[in-house]
A protein has these predicted regions:
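Ligand-site clamp/hinge motif
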Residues: 4-50, 168, 177-179
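Short helices/loops that flank or line small-molecule/ion binding pockets
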Residues: 26-37, 54-55, 83-84, 165-174, ...
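Detector for C-terminal structural segments
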Residues: 3, 92-122, 159-168, 186-298
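Periplasmic-binding protein-like
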Residues: 59-73, 117, 225-231
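Alpha-helical secondary-structure segments
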Residues: 14-16, 34, 66-111, 138, ...
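Bilobed "Venus flytrap"/periplasmic-binding protein-like clamshell domains
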Residues: 1-8, 100, 129-138, 149, ...
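A ligand-binding cleft/hinge motif common to bilobed small-molecule-binding domains
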Residues: 43-55, 206-210
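Structural recognition of the beta-strand scaffold that forms the well-ordered cores
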Residues: 18-21, 39-42, 60-62, 69-72, ...
């Protein structure tokens, strides 16, 4: 990208910026260490960050962003169309231990589909504390037999792989046998997100304030609830901040009750950059990488 000399507003400091698309985090870390990359916002593999500890020209800055990791359940398929099964799966997973495993406990266990950096985030009580016995009771009441087999698909990114492996172990303890299905991004986007052809999947939604996806008829996890629809329509129709906030909290509570997906955790955002770079976003409210205020400091 080159600076536009005819831009009407404040001119950016940098003359040009080159974006490099590097899907392999290890290769990206090598490029950062070699000085071939100057910055990597939202570095995806936390276990690699230690490589930068002794790099004098680099710094790692931890910030916030609307990261919401979920175990998405296909509400249009049996047995996930039964709320008791979805709640049982939530009880079967120790989400605090999960957060500890994937991020050394740095983050927040989620109770609904909203990240802590959202102004409307509601710190709801934990409706589904780790309780394998309660999970077995709910599965039995829903007619789910021990040994029931399901498939858990996940895209090629570290948190999804690690989380999926741990969830498979937790569900096996309550009688659900999980087959792990790793997918490359094109296959995941086509089969899971596009066609809704899956049982369960681990994915992080990083769009800000995207709770409205639960009111979409075409959403990949096939959740439909008239009560949530009514709340969202009232939210959309209101312009009063207090009313919208109250309705947002109600929507979060409704999702926590229905548990269309198992809400797992939100973790911070790590940005790796040259120590002389200034002005790059480290906290991210929206999915953007503004460059107008970025500059090199001595």
């Amino acid at each position: 990208l080159a600076r536009n000399p005819n831009y009407w507003g404040k001119p950016p400091v940098l003359k040009s910026v080159t974006f490099r698309f590097m899907p392999d985090p290890l290769a990206a870390s090598n490029a950062l260490l070699a000085g071939e990359l100057d910055a990597y916002p939202s570095f995806p593999e936390r276990e690699i960050l230690g490589r930068f500890a002794d790099a004098p020209e680099l710094r790692v800055i931890r910030g916030s962003f609307p990261f919401k990791a979920i175990l998405a359940l296909n509400n249009g398929r049996r047995p996930f169309n039964d709320v008791r099964v979805r709640q049982a799966i939530a009880y079967a997973i120790d989400r605090k231990a999960l957060l500890q495993a994937v991020s050394d406990g740095d983050g927040t266990v989620l109770q609904s589909h909203m990240a802590p950096n959202d102004p409307d985030y509601a710190p709801l009580p934990d409706r589904y504390p780790y309780n394998p016995e309660r999970a077995r009771e709910l599965l039995k009441s829903a007619g789910v037999q021990p040994g029931t087999q399901v498939r858990l698909s996940f895209p090629p990114i570290g948190y999804a792989r690690d989380t999926s492996e741990l969830i498979a172990a937790y569900l096996e303890q309550v009688g659900i046998i999980v087959t792990l299905q790793p997918l490359e991004w094109p296959a995941w986007l086509s089969r899971v997100f596009g066609q809704g052809a899956f049982d369960m999947t681990v994915i992080a939604h990083t769009e800000p304030h995207d709770i409205g996806i639960y009111d979409r008829d075409t959403i990949y996890f096939h959740y439909h609830n008239p009560a949530f629809h009514d709340l969202f329509q009232r939210y959309e129709a209101s312009s009063a901040p207090a009313t919208r906030h109250a309705l947002s909290v109600s929507m979060q509570s409704q999702l926590a009750q229905d548990e269309p997906n198992v809400f797992l955790y939100s973790v911070p955002r790590d940005t790796v950059m040259n120590r002389h770079i200034r002005g790059l976003w480290t906290d991210q409210q929206i999915a953007a990488c503004p460059l107008a205020d970025v500059y090199w400091a001595p």
